[in-house]
């Protein structure tokens, strides 16, 4: 069953310029993983420092494999130095989809 991971994290706006290259690296590495259909971050235009997260995974096994990657470990280890906080991410199981 397809999984969607969606939510937000916060980063102090003054750290965004230094943090963006890490987001780009994480997106590229994650998108290359088997089972990843989509992986992205978006900065909220109305609330500086609020980052929206969207991921799509083939199944739970693919998501669990993602959590065990070296790039995920580096990503999480970098968070304290950039002040990443308020991690609010949720997984959704998708039973079906249709175009809107």
Say what each PLM segment does:
Residues 3-40:
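N-terminal first-folded block
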Residues 3-10, 40-67:
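Short, well-ordered beta-strand segments in beta-rich or mixed alpha/beta enzyme
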Residues 25-37, 56-90:
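An amphipathic, aromatic/His-enriched active-site/gating alpha helix that lines ligand/cofactor pockets
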Residues 41-49, 77-100:
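Glycine-rich beta-strand-turn "strand-cap" elements at beta-sheet edges
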